[in-house]
Amino acid sequence: MGLVIKLVRHCESEANTGKVNAHEVGDHAIPLSPHGQGHAREVGRALGREYVAGSLLYASPYKRTRETLSGILEGCGLTLDDVAGSYEDPRLREVEHGYEPIESQAELRRTHGWFYYRFRGGESPADCYDRTSSFLESMMRQVERKDTERVLIVTHGLAVRCFVMRFLHLSVEQFDSLANPHNGAIITLADKTTLVDPIFTNDYWGVSGLTLRVGDE
C-alpha cells in the first residue's frame, strides 16, 4: 500500500467552547472540553487499533493535543508502549498568534495575504510552514530507520494545512483555499489511487479529509 500519513486536528478544547481565553491561561495549557475528551476516543476507534498500533506517533506538546492523543489510544485500547514509536515535537505546535486580538488584524491579513501576514508578536503561516518543513524531513528519516509505512500526527489546524502544503508542494493560492479542519478531523495523505475524492493530488500522492474555504472563514 505504501506510506500512509494520517493527521488529526486536536478535538474540541475549552477555548473552542469559549470557556477559556488563551491570553489568560496560555495557549499551550488549554485542555480539551468534556465533549472533546469523548470525541478523541471516537477518533481512536475510527482510526482503528491496527493502524494506530503500527504507526509512528507524533504530537504537538500542547495540552489539548496530548489529551487528544491519550483519548485516541484509549479508544483503541492501546498505550504508548504498544505503538511503533511515539514522539512529541514542538515544531508541530499551534501557530503563535501573538498577544493582540486576531480580529483587529483582519484587514491587514487581507492586504498582505493570509499566508504571509505575521501576527503582531507572533508568527505567520509562512513561519509555521518553515518549521513544519523541517519536521517533515526529520519524520521521513525516522520512517526510513523504523521501516514503517504508517504515521499518525496529532497537531493543530494550521499546522495540518502547512504539512499538506509542504508534502504535496501546493501553491500559496491552494493553501489559502483550504478551510481549517474541524476538531478531530482525520486527514489522510497516501497514494492517490487509494483515496476517495482527494481534494488535491500530484503525480503519486493525494490528500483527503480537507475542504475548501468559503469566503473569509
Language-model features: locations:
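Phosphate-handling substructures
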Residues: 14-15, 30-31, 73-134, 200-201
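Short glycine-rich phosphate-binding loop at a beta-alpha junction
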Residues: 53-61, 87, 150-154
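GST-like fold's C-terminal all-alpha helical module
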Residues: 128-145, 149-157
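Active-site-proximal alpha-helix that buttresses catalytic centers in soluble enzyme cores
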Residues: 2-80, 123-127, 132
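Acidic, low-complexity terminal tails and accessory targeting/binding regions
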Residues: 1-4, 49, 78, 88, ...
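Short active-site segment of divalent metal-dependent hydrolases/proteases
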Residues: 13, 159-160
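Domain-wide signal for the mature, well-folded portions of proteins, strongly enriched
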Residues: 5-7, 19-21, 38-41, 45-50, ...
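Active-site signature of alpha/beta-hydrolase-fold catalytic machinery across serine-
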Residues: 71, 162-166
